[in-house]
């Protein structure tokens, strides 16, 4: 576990079923240091200005308990191999620290808790020789009373189907990225999509556009952005640009931390899908996640080209393969970036291994980006399997007629043609009608 992982402010709102007095850990995490000092002085904490921020929160909570208050904590459950678990805070990196709450094996068995469950409960402060808070009473699991989730299904037992409901990405007439994707590479609930991206082709901006389109058109969808091995400034930019929850493990952290964060995010998404929710995970990038797995996988003696161990890609494939539309209700959509043309043979091997696993591909082209055309979207190479289910017969026919016309053009001409026509229309319906008249 990495105790030096960066923390981020959480906008997560705690939902409880019983009123509990006092300050909550989640609230304290969001307060500026000046506010924490004000609270500490109010509670008569000795010399609060001498404490670091994390330690000051700890002192406030400890003092609150000694004065008869309660602590209510909501966190994501991470179960350890030995059977006990911890509730991690919504700080964007699930970093472990003194503010985490210990959950005993007996509580996990009694309430049939699973990795990724969001647990709300009353906790007590650490006793002598104890390092963590301890969970006393569970108030809610995944924001529901505990008795309501006892019969929930297991994710792996649910029936996967082809995506049959489109996620609309078009949200503004001038934002043509979502409009193009809606027609030429539509994304449905339960899609397993790859964004194939050479360096500097605008994949980060594309991810922001996807997030904006999803949150604008589908408030019922829970959006999670997972950034693996990214630069810290990219994480901050993403947090400020999108409305979904951003979880990250930056490049200065070890590969084990990348894997831990990714798997906990996936388990959280699965728990929501088990309850019939629609969840979208935007992953940047599947290539770096696979690299992390390759770094920690014990050598099997079978090494593929580029230094990839033959067994290293099984777990990232399981991550990507979790995306599915569920017959019983709910869906898990994963849209992941795959890096190509990086100069690394390992990245090429990873891409080839994932190439056939998705059911949708969004291809970005370096030669288009070099012309300063964004999005650098290769319309001719991008597409979605079974797009007839998502588009409907009438729209599909119009799109295929348009594709046939563009087959006579190169990729830059095709994109420029569509881009210019979309700029003249306010939505895709008007665009298709305009194309139909020509």
From Swiss-Prot:
ATP binds at residues 188-193, 200-205, 231. One of its GO terms (molecular function) is helicase activity. Signal peptide: none annotated. It comes from the Bacteria. GO terms for biological process: DNA-templated transcription termination. Facilitates transcription termination by a mechanism that involves Rho binding to the nascent RNA, activation of Rho's RNA-dependent ATPase activity, and release of the mRNA from the DNA template. This is Transcription termination factor Rho. It comes from Helicobacter pylori (strain J99 / ATCC 700824). The lineage of its organism: Bacteria, Pseudomonadati, Campylobacterota, Epsilonproteobacteria, Campylobacterales.
